[in-house]
Amino acid sequence: MKFFKKKKKPVYDTADQSFVASVLDALNLSHGDAVLEISKDSVLAEKYFANRYGAYVKQLKTASEFTGGFFELSVMIDVVSDFENLFEIARENSEQVAVIYLKKCVEELPPKFCGAPCKTSVSSGNYKFFLF
């Protein structure tokens, strides 16, 4: 019988906790699908689809992709209870994840949103969250 090692819950400082709470609040206020983007230096990466109950990260491409390396991961995330796992996955596999974009009710993020001004943004360390 194979036993799986239980992963320790990550420890976050106050800024990280506040940031995760802000992201959760924004997701809980949204209706329908949203698009999450992880990118570096204004280069858009893959799309991530979410609703107020959960998120499926189709392809997680971290900043290592833009520095000659490449990392890809598929994972199911329960946004309400487990959204911080996205940050933990990013921390484990890349030195920096620069930007997370959230665009409500849009499947394809138009090029005009690359570097576009946003209505709301919160940040913690290397992470930024934008609500257009």
Language-model features and meaning:
Residues 98-131:
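C-terminal substrate-binding/active-site "lid" region of AdoMet-derived donor-dependent transferases
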Residues 42-52:
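Conserved SAM-binding loop of SAM-dependent methyltransferases across substrates and taxa
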Residues 53-65:
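A short, well-structured beta->alpha microelement
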Residues 31-41:
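Conserved class I S-adenosyl-L-methionine
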Residues 1-18:
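Class I SAM-dependent transferase core
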Residues 13-33:
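Conserved alpha-helix/loop element of class I SAM-dependent methyltransferases that forms part
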Residues 84-98:
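A short glycine-rich, Lys/Arg-flanked "PGG" loop and its adjoining helix->strand segment in the class I
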Residues 64-74:
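A short acidic, Gly/Pro-enriched loop at the edge of an enzyme's catalytic core
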